[in-house]
């Protein structure tokens, strides 16, 4: 977004902005037909054009978010980065639309006398105010959706991390038993049974594998 200042004179309307807005005003000049003998209708049509630009962009963000959030479990970090960018844009839109709506509503207040309005102009201002409020409501709804998606993604990531840590812990315990048995029987210590024969070797291997399997089975089942 970029700020625009409207200067309304008796014979002309002037817009001033820090950035070139050819993409906004050139289609307006080419396609919109509006009487220029009165400043109020021209100003309101220009505001309507700006509002339509916001409506188009918010609708595009809504479509892209609906497509990206069909499966929360398969969201990627890139999707979360995109949502953060959407959040920034939506907050910028709110920062622009809320003051604009306030200024429009003030034109209806005869105490301020900001702009001479006829009855049809007042109806157009009211319609624009309603449309702006709808866009504001949609922006706030999308921001809530982004917050919910990020919370859900964080919960999914926490669950995956806990599952990974549990599996690693079980694997560590399972590998500890064969290592411990190998260390014990590898010591130069006399045992009451033969530890040098082939049968003793396979017995130790069998006990190690059985113990590791039982521990893994127990902790994998205990969730």
Residue ranges of each PLM-predicted region?
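Hydrophobic alpha-helical transmembrane segments and their immediately adjacent juxtamembrane loops
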Residues: 130-223
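Extended amphipathic alpha-helical scaffolding segments in membrane-proximal extra-membrane regions
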Residues: 2-156
């Amino acid at each position: 977004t970029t700020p625009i200042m409207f200067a309304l004179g008796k014979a002309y309307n002037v817009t001033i902005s820090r950035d070139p807005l050819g993409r906004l005003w050139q289609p307006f000049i080419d396609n919109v037909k509006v009487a220029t003998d009165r400043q109020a209708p021209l100003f309101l049509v220009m505001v309507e054009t700006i509002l339509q630009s916001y409506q188009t962009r918010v609708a595009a963000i809504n479509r892209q978010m609906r497509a990206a959030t069909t499966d929360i479990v398969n969201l990627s970090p890139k999707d979360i980065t995109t949502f953060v960018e959407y959040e920034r844009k939506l907050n910028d839109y709110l920062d622009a639309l809320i003051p604009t709506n306030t200024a429009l509503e003030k034109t209806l207040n005869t105490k301020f006398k900001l702009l001479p309005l006829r009855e049809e102009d007042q109806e157009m201002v009211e319609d624009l105010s309603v449309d702006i409020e709808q866009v504001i409501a949609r922006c706030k709804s999308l921001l809530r959706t982004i917050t919910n998606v990020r919370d859900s993604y964080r919960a999914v990531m926490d669950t995956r991390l806990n599952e990974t840590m549990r599996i690693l812990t079980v694997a560590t315990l399972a590998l500890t038993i064969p290592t411990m048995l190998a260390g014990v029987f590898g010591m130069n210590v006399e045992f009451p049974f033969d530890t040098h024969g082939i049968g003793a070797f396979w017995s130790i291997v069998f006990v190690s594998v059985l113990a590791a399997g039982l521990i893994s089975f127990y902790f994998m089942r205990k969730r």
